[in-house]
Amino acid sequence: MAETLSGKTPLFAGSTGGLLTKAVEEEKYAITWTSPKAQVFELPTGGAATMHEGENLLYIARKEYGIALGGQLRKFKITNYKIYRILPSGETTFIHPADGVFPEKVNPGREKVRFNARSIGENPNPSQVKFSGKATYDA
C-alpha cells in the first residue's frame, strides 16, 4: 500500500525526543490526525508541541509512541487519528486501528478470542485439568 500521507508537522517548543537512527534505517511510524483548533499537547517522548488546525502529521520511532500520543489526543476529543508503519523502501502500511474500530470499542464483526461462555465460578478445578493433556483455556 503506497499511501501518501499529508498534513503539517506540529510546532515543537524545546526537546522533541527525536527519531532514533534505527527508525530511519529500519522503519519508522507516522501518526495523522485532524484538529479543530491549534492547541498544545504533550509528546510521548518528552517535551511539548503545538498542533495545527486541520491535518497534522508526526513521524515517530515506535508504534507505542503513537498509541500513547493517541491517548493524549483523546483528551482533546480527537479520535480520528491513524498510525502507519513506513519502511525504508517507502512502503506505507496502515496499522492502527487495524479494522477501523479501536480495540476498546465493540465491533459487531469482531470475533471473540478464547471466549468461554461461563462465569469464573464455573471454571474447572485446575488440579483436574493439569494432567489431562488439555490447556487450561481449552477446558
UniProtKB/Swiss-Prot annotation:
One of its GO terms (biological process) is photosynthesis. Disulfide bonds: none annotated. Keywords: Photosynthesis, Photosystem I. Residues 119-139 are annotated as: Disordered. It comes from the Bacteria. GO terms for cellular component: photosystem I reaction center. PsaD can form complexes with ferredoxin and ferredoxin-oxidoreductase in photosystem I (PS I) reaction center. Belongs to the PsaD family. This is Photosystem I reaction center subunit II. It comes from Trichormus variabilis (strain ATCC 29413 / PCC 7937). The lineage of its organism: Bacteria, Bacillati, Cyanobacteriota, Cyanophyceae, Nostocales. The gene is psaD.
